[in-house]
């Protein structure tokens, strides 16, 4: 079956479903790397992607945002001039109650009320003020970091804002 739209999983109610030792068949998160670029660089500013609303971000959306930001930064500023880090981890296991999806299926299957469902993926729960992604750059690459995070935010299902913080004393805030 195809993947359901993100709107089915964006909002949440109730506690997170995270106990993997009791859940058989949880798929692995699609996020390949959580830290990219030059880890040991000397940077001036830290740009953060901060969430405005509470919700859930699926692991494939986090991976799409990571790929978009990393590709833009590596092509514009070079691999040695930035450090990109994903700050959230998709712990919450998403479930889906599989239903028949073809013509006339409504006559064959009513479905059970409040059916539990099988694990289909994972999501990260975020709240207002949660930092999802951070980019560290030098002063001359600040505009590229802003554009990379703007592109990454377009891949996420919730609204976000970009905040810059100076890493060294004496630098003025942006």
UniProtKB/Swiss-Prot annotation:
UniProt superkingdom: Archaea
Keyword Translocase present in the record's keywords: the answer is no
Listed CDD domains: Ribosomal_L16_L10e
Query: Which keywords has UniProt assigned to this entry?
Result: Ribonucleoprotein, Ribosomal protein
Kindly list the GO molecular function terms attached to this UniProt entry: structural constituent of ribosome
> What biological-process terms (Gene Ontology) are attached?
translation
SUPFAM superfamilies referenced in this protein's UniProt entry, alphabetically: Ribosomal protein L16p/L10e
The record's listing under Pfam families reads:
Ribosomal_L16
Q: Which GO terms describe its cellular component?
A: ribonucleoprotein complex; ribosome
Family, per the entry? Belongs to the universal ribosomal protein uL16 family.
HAMAP family, from UniProt?
Answer: Ribosomal_uL16_arch
The protein's name is Large ribosomal subunit protein uL16
Q: Which organism is it from?
A: Staphylothermus marinus (strain ATCC 43588 / DSM 3639 / JCM 9404 / F1)
């Amino acid at each position: 079956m195809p993947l359901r739209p993100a709107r089915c999983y964006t909002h949440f109610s109730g506690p997170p479903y995270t106990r993997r030792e009791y859940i058989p068949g949880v798929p692995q998160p699609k996020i390949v790397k959580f830290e990219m670029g030059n880890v040991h660089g000397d940077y001036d500013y830290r740009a953060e992607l901060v969430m405005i609303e509470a919700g859930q971000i699926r692991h494939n959306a986090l991976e799409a945002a990571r790929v978009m930001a990393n590709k833009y930064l590596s092509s514009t500023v070079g691999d040695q001039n930035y450090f990109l880090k994903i700050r959230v981890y998709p712990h919450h296991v998403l479930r889906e109650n599989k239903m028949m999806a073809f013509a006339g299926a409504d006559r064959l299957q009513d479905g059970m009320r409040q059916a539990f469902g099988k694990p289909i993926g994972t999501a990260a729960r975020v709240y207002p003020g949660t930092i999802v992604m951070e980019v560290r750059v030098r002063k001359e690459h600040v505009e590229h970091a802003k554009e990379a995070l703007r592109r990454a935010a377009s891949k996420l299902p919730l609204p976000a804002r970009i905040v810059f913080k100076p890493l060294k004393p004496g630098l003025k805030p942006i």
